[in-house]
Regions:
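The feature captures the conserved acid-bearing segment of alpha/beta-hydrolase catalytic domains
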Residues: 157-196
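Short beta-strand segments enriched for Tyr within beta-sheet-rich domains
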Residues: 20, 156-157
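Gly/Ala-rich beta-loop-alpha elbow adjacent to hydrolase catalytic centers
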Residues: 137-141, 145
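Proline/glycine-enriched tight loop/beta-turn segments at coil->beta junctions
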Residues: 7-22, 186-188
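Short beta-strand immediately N-terminal to the catalytic nucleophile in serine-hydrolase-like folds
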Residues: 135-137, 162
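Serine-hydrolase catalytic machinery in alpha/beta-hydrolase-like enzymes
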Residues: 17-134, 147, 151, 175
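Short hydrophobic segments within beta-strands
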Residues: 3, 25-26, 136, 194
């Protein structure tokens, strides 16, 4: 889902004459776009703060989750549980895989590319201020926000992680390994970490 401010014009600058910001808001494990939108009601600020709000959804997983199925905690493969393949700490694999270096164990699909392409698509259609591109994530989405900062710091101004964290094994964060990484070493990302 995409929420646009009144000033945003496709394929051009905004009607206010300045570029708009972009916030990608990522839901937590076993949530969806509607539930994160209700929990963190950012769309009410889209017009006054002049930013585009993108609310994508993670893939469905079919593992048991007491908070995600609609049948009182019993696995419901019809609805499943939406998650992000974020880090080795959380959550696409149905739980943390302590310090595993085998990405396939916790990354059954490539959400980094999915979110990267979403940001690129919005940037191609609207004039986005590159100093105002943020990923905000709650819980599993907060882990995914950290992952985006690790793998694509060049496209982000900052992240907000609410009850999320980074990799259990810090060496998996590509931005921290600038010697062996394709990530530019001068790409800095502001981080607001909220826990509680």
């Amino acid at each position: 889902r995409l929420f646009l401010p009144d000033v945003a014009l496709p394929n051009g600058t905004s009607s206010s004459g300045k570029d708009v910001g972009l916030v990608v808001m990522l839901h937590g494990r076993c949530m969806d776009g509607n539930s994160i939108d209700q929990l963190i009601d950012l769309k009410k600020h889209v017009d006054t703060r002049e930013f585009i709000l993108a609310v994508p959804e993670g893939h469905r997983q079919n593992f048991w989750c007491s908070t995600c199925s609609r049948s009182d905690g019993i696995l419901n493969t019809r609805y499943g549980c939406r998650t992000w393949a974020a880090t080795d700490a959380c959550c696409a694999s149905a739980g943390p895989l302590r310090a595993t270096l085998v990405r396939e164990a916790w990354e059954p699909y490539d959400d980094v590319t999915h979110i990267y392409q979403l940001i690129a698509a919005v940037k191609s259609q609207y004039e986005i201020d590159p100093t105002r591109v943020f990923v905000l994530g709650f819980e599993n989405g907060g882990f995914m926000a950290h992952r985006m900062a690790c793998e694509h710091p060049e496209m982000l101004s900052g992240i907000v992680s609410i009850s999320g964290s980074s990799f259990l094994n810090a060496s998996m964060c590509e931005a921290l390994n600038t010697v062996s990484s394709s990530v530019p070493s001068n790409s800095f990302v502001n981080v607001l970490q909220i826990s509680g």
